[in-house]
Amino acid sequence: MATAPTPREEFVYMAKLAEQAERYEEMVEFMEKVTAAVESEELTVEERNLLSVAYKNVIGARRASWRIISSIEQKEESRGNDEHVSVIRDYRSKIETELSNICNGILKLLDSRLIPSAALGDSKVFYLKMKGDYHRYLAEFKSGAERKDAAESTLTAYKSAQDIANTELPPTHPIRLGLALNFSVFYYEILNSPDRACGLAKQAFDEAIAELDTLGEESYKDSTLIMQLLRDNLTLWTSDMQDDGADEIKEAAPKGNDEPQ
């Protein structure tokens, strides 16, 4: 007779079902239950990837909505349609509230549970990178002092992750490469520092290329995929720093192995 699954195992299974059904809000709820069930224990690689996928999809839909609405707002402003602009701003504010709530939810979980319980180098980098990502998402739409605070928090988290990654993970490790990818996007998009963005991306790419022959079959696909994204961004940024192609900028996607959706 098969052993009855633990609540933790049931929540993981339900999260996978929710992912298949593309019901990502529920996927987040199930993975938060997994996190609560493990207490001070660390999540498995599979569990942390599921948590990351869930939140990335929930936030990703709102980020896309915000960009579309902001673009429409700019067009209506240029046409002088003040009535439309007022309606659009209210709608954008609603989306921004949702974005804030999602980001604050995962950031609280990272600070209270996930980062303190991380014991291994790859776990620490994974969660600190995640912390940087969600502060960066806040910086995308905040303004004034709030934007400054979000940007500073992003920089602190990414730098902490980078310090650990550079000492504990090889240059070809997909989590280290994913961190470099997102950190460089932060420099380019949030800090408006294309030189730093290109420098970071190029260094990560070159260091990984130098050790490509040591890459195991297990992570070869993931690592080379992120290296391609780094190279794509470098091409985009260096070809024309003034180009409005920011929407094409690649960043590491939800899974721990940074595969794009």
UniProtKB/Swiss-Prot annotation:
Gene3D superfamilies: 14-3-3 domain. It comes from Vicia faba (Broad bean). It comes from the Eukaryota. Belongs to the 14-3-3 family. This is 14-3-3-like protein A. PROSITE patterns: 1433_1, 1433_2.
